[in-house]
UniProtKB/Swiss-Prot annotation:
Name by which UniProt lists this protein: Toluene-4-monooxygenase system, effector component
Function, in words: Effector component of the toluene-4-monooxygenase multicomponent enzyme system which catalyzes the O2- and NADH-dependent hydroxylation of toluene to form p-cresol. Required for optimal efficiency and specificity of the holoenzyme.
Transmembrane segments: none
Molecular function, one GO term: monooxygenase activity
Keyword Transport annotated: no
Primary gene name: tmoD
Positions in coiled-coil regions: none
Sorted UniProt keywords: Aromatic hydrocarbons catabolism
Length: 103
């Protein structure tokens, strides 16, 4: 029998936790487009939204710009992160959430 603690220990979901606002829907769409074949889960907690995938989740500036319909600076996403799950690697073209090791 699996306990909630066991499930949490073996949870390899990674991704952004974004403050509620104008970026939420474009980031969800971007996660789905930039991570084909991955199941993207979304938990809306009113004040913030948790967007996650198993093991790795990538968000690209190009796709975010397409979804927003305007130029986008990746630092704008970083400012709106309440938190994140996993490790993070960011540059001017993409943000990658990942785990080096899985449980």
């Amino acid at each position: 029998m699996s306990t909630l603690a066991d499930q949490a220990l073996h949870n390899n979901n990674v991704g952004p936790i974004i403050r509620a606002g104008d970026l939420v829907e474009p980031v969800i769409e971007t996660a789905e487009i930039d991570n084909p074949g991955k199941e993207i889960t979304v938990e809306d907690r009113r004040a913030y939204v948790r967007i996650a995938a198993e093991g790795e989740l990538i968000l690209t500036r190009k796709t975010l710009e397409e979804q927003l319909g305007r130029p986008f600076n990746m630092q704008e996403l970083e400012i709106n992160l309440a938190s994140f799950a996993g490790q993070i690697q960011a540059d001017e073209d993409q943000i990658r959430f990942y785990f080096d090791k899985t449980m």
